[in-house]
Amino acid sequence: MSSCFCSKSQETEKRGAVSEDQLVISDDSTHPANLICELCKVFYNNGWVTGTGGGISIREGSKIYIAPSGVQKERMVPDNMFVMDLESENYLRTPLTLKPSACTPLFLSAYKMRDAGACIHTHSQAAVMVTLLYDKVFEISSIEQIKAIPKVTEKGNLMYSDRLVIPIIENTEREEDLTDSLQQAIEEYPGTTAVLVRRHGIYVWGETVWKAKVYNEAIDYLLELALKMHQLGIPTVKQN
């Protein structure tokens, strides 16, 4: 007669499988796994994450949710998500058929060095083009949209007449090899909420996913504006 009881190891495996799914399946539209899918579609429609490029991660307490590598952003579903414990950097959930995002160590840098709540990586054409025109930093001032960007080192946002400074780091053959340069830029520019990568794109983070989204949109607007100003011979930093 066959037994109706499972071994302890089998029970553990079943419980683990269920708990892994519970990490990403929710009817709550604000759940990180659902938000990542929603935002990936928005970024795809904006032309920022074509051809599976780019990435996004959202932090919820000690857990971080990360969009996978190799999945078309407009087709992303919650079941595609990786989930990691921030402190141990161990995966709590790994989709069997997908690869972790190569952006993960850079996301971790934003979480641990800036206590970010979310980090966005896009391949925005404006971001790429600006890095071909500027050397070590991108600078712009006296544009109203600058007021959407935080001061970071003190309370409040930048003012109209303030100068926005975003460091530019050199690209590498592999995404994860950008980690040291990004960390160095974060240390050297404590007031920045973004880092540009030459001929590649941009990383933007914020206290919450919504703030990161606002910063990303505002910065991309400013980058596009800077390109048009350059074409017309207008300095991006207003001269007194």
Curated annotation (Swiss-Prot):
Zn(2+) binds at residues 121, 123, 200. InterPro entries: Aldolase_II/adducin_N, Aldolase_II/adducin_N_sf, MethylthioRu-1-P_deHdtase_MtnB, Salvage_MtnB_euk. Binds 1 zinc ion per subunit. One of its GO terms (biological process) is L-methionine salvage from methylthioadenosine. Gene3D superfamilies: Class II aldolase/adducin N-terminal domain. The active site is at residue 144. Its EC number is 4.2.1.109. One of its GO terms (molecular function) is methylthioribulose 1-phosphate dehydratase activity. Substrate binds at residue 103. Pathway: Amino-acid biosynthesis; L-methionine biosynthesis via salvage pathway; L-methionine from S-methyl-5-thio-alpha-D-ribose 1-phosphate: step 2/6. Coiled coil: none annotated. Its cofactor is Zn(2+). It is found in: Cytoplasm. The keyword Cytoplasm applies. It catalyses: 5-(methylsulfanyl)-D-ribulose 1-phosphate = 5-methylsulfanyl-2,3-dioxopentyl phosphate + H2O. Keywords: Amino-acid biosynthesis, Cytoplasm, Lyase, Metal-binding, Methionine biosynthesis, Zinc. GO terms for cellular component: cytoplasm. Catalyzes the dehydration of methylthioribulose-1-phosphate (MTRu-1-P) into 2,3-diketo-5-methylthiopentyl-1-phosphate (DK-MTP-1-P). Belongs to the aldolase class II family. MtnB subfamily. This is Methylthioribulose-1-phosphate dehydratase. It comes from Komagataella phaffii (strain GS115 / ATCC 20864). The lineage of its organism: Eukaryota, Fungi, Dikarya, Ascomycota, Saccharomycotina. The gene is MDE1.
